[in-house]
Amino acid sequence: MVRVPGFSFVQPVVWLSFGSVQIHLFDRVDAVPTYQHVGLEVDDFESVYRAVRQRQLLDKTFGHYCYELPDGSVQLYFRDPAGNLIEVDWPDVRNLDRKVISDIRLLSEDIPQVPGVDASLFLNR
């Protein structure tokens, strides 16, 4: 396992990689958090977005439900019907139809980022 550069978030986080897999470890000292989640890459981000929005499952645990990260990747957060927090990832915001998804917020607008960090949500791309 190797530590890799990561973006800044509200709480301290360490990004680790092993092979083509990443794990992000958050450091919290307060009560059991409600932000524990699984992150998934999908083949059709826009279809997932439409389905989640239609079912009113979008979740603002992290301040907003759809963020563009500094590397151009996108994260969408929602709760499944059982209440589990799900993160859906997309590698390139430029490949999304902004008429379908018009509410993507820049992470850097909410959380200042460290300039020059060579981080990527997607490894080897």
PLM region descriptions:
Residues G19-Q22, D30-V32, D43-V48:
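Short, charged/polar surface micro-motifs in flexible loops or helix N-caps
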Residues M1-Q22:
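Core segments of cupin and vicinal oxygen chelate
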Residues P33-H37:
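Short, solvent-exposed beta-strand edge segments and adjacent coil->beta transition regions
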Residues H24-F26, E87:
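Conserved beta-strand in the GNAT
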Residues V38-L85, V93-L96, I111-R125:
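Vicinal oxygen chelate
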Residues V100-E109:
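Short, compositionally biased
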